[in-house]
Amino acid sequence: FMNIVRTLGGDPFKQVVSCPQSVGWGGAMGPAQFIASTWVLFEDRISSNLGISGIPDPWNPAHAFMASSIYLGDLGASSGTYSAERNAACKYYSGRSCSASSLIASYGNQVISRADTIQRTMIDPLQGL
């Protein structure tokens, strides 16, 4: 976390994360909610896909959602099936597939429901314009 923020020219003691802790750095960064250790795994691919040099910024929406698309694809969502997309959402959230855990499965179901609503109400109506 400290290296990411400092490389971006920020102050790690002032940078907002989702769950600040009184000691250390807890919580996820930016709109896509990546933890620092996961973000660094994707830095090179994010930069390459965006055509940028240097470190991508987890607080920049374009960088954050490119990272999400890469990560969700790696988690299996790129196959495009309901089950694969739902499991990828669960893995993004918890590191595990949608299983018997009602909390994790509920999260995956909510993600798929919202994605379906966005597809039907915002994307499909634009087709053929």
What do the predicted segments below correspond to?
Residues 1-129:
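Non-catalytic cell-wall polysaccharide-engagement segments
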